[in-house]
A protein has these predicted regions:
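Generic structural hydrophobic/aromatic packing signal, biased to beta-strands
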Residues: 1-2, 19, 30, 131-133
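C-terminal catalytic subdomain
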Residues: 47-138
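Short acidic/polar capping segments at secondary-structure boundaries
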Residues: 6-8, 17-19, 25-27, 35-36, ...
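Short, conserved beta-strand edge motifs with alternating hydrophobic and charged residues
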Residues: 12, 22, 67-69
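Glycine- and acidic-residue-rich phosphate-binding/metal-coordinating active-site segment common to enzymes
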Residues: 22-51
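Catalytic core of PPM/PP2C metal-dependent serine/threonine phosphatase domains
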Residues: 1-20, 55-60, 123
Length: 138
């Protein structure tokens, strides 16, 4: 999860997936996605020990751009060698959001759904695919 205001930003994470954010210096992945003890094992907010596993990141800067995603698109969204944001994945989304008219914004949920269920994406993952995007508007 993420909370951001003019006074700062708080990012919270438990489990896999991730939150990519631009705090004014380019996209970054402040928290490394968690992995369980075994492959395909993760931690959930409903686990008894969730509070002790919760990872947090704080900044005194507001978030200009945010993308939160589930593990199903993690390999598309991140450079897995160094857990950095894969810019060719995020740039079209953020550029589209920044320049979209209201009519185009109304179409984005359906277009995002089509993209996430497309053959090109499904060839690379068979896991759940969720992507939430946000921009700070002046």
């Amino acid at each position: 999860g993420l909370i951001s205001s003019a006074n700062g930003t708080l990012i919270m994470q438990i489990g896999d997936g991730g939150v990519v954010v631009d705090l004014g210096h380019g996209l970054q992945l402040p928290l490394t996605p968690m992995v369980g003890e075994y492959a395909n094992m993760t931690h959930f907010i409903t686990d008894e020990d969730a509070v002790s596993r919760l990872d947090t990141f704080t900044s005194t800067e507001r978030a200009h751009k945010v993308a939160a995603f589930t593990d199903g698109i993690q390999r598309l969204a991140l450079n897995m060698l160094d857990n950095s944001p894969h810019m060719p994945f995020f740039t079209p989304f953020f550029n589209g959001l920044a320049s979209a008219t209201q009519e185009q914004l109304d179409l984005l949920p359906e277009l995002l759904k089509q993209f996430l269920s497309s053959p090109a994406v499904n060839e690379r993952t068979d896991d759940d695919k969720t992507l939430a995007l946000a921009l700070w508007l002046p």
